[in-house]
Amino acid sequence: MKIKLSAALLFAFLLLTGCRVEMATEQVHPIPKPTGIKVDIAGTVMLQEKELIVEGQTNLPKDAIMYAGIKEYGDHESYARVINAKAEEFEEYIAEGTGKVNDEGQFQIRIDRINPKKRYKLEVLFNPAIQKSKIQEIYGMTGENIRTNIGYTEFKHNGNFVNGMIKVAPIVNIDDYSGNGFKWNLTDVFQGKSRPLQ
């Protein structure tokens, strides 16, 4: 027994001496500052019987185009899964709308609520590929000048990859709690959950 224990300790000692860390020779590299232009988007969506009204605030320049679309969840997806961002939505937008940023950085987008008895995922996007040339000069045609931060996403537009910014919100069934006459906050895809505000 003592021989086995001694052999195990010797083996562990030899193994650990070969795994030492040499910290004195490591060089510390400074963390580079983020490059690019930071895009901030915040807002809400008002759920009405026949229409969804997105109201937002951004640091984008005047006349930047904001896009919004809804994707349907399957009938099997529950209220809890939808509001907790666990549900799987279909890939295609079934209703879309756009709005322009004004002088104060505000925008509004109206989308038809196709079927109030269904649940949807709302996506609000800044897509550089659909902007006028004066906006594309700032952010790049494919968003190459946008700084990576919360809400930054890559998606396909007309077969090309584009970098942009996204916010989301659940659109619950009109008969669900807070499904009609309530505002929901727009949130980041991976950072928290949208909740009703009123």
Task: Kindly give the residue locations of the regions a language model identified.
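C-terminal motif of bacterial Sec signal peptides marking the signal peptidase cleavage site
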Residues: 15-18
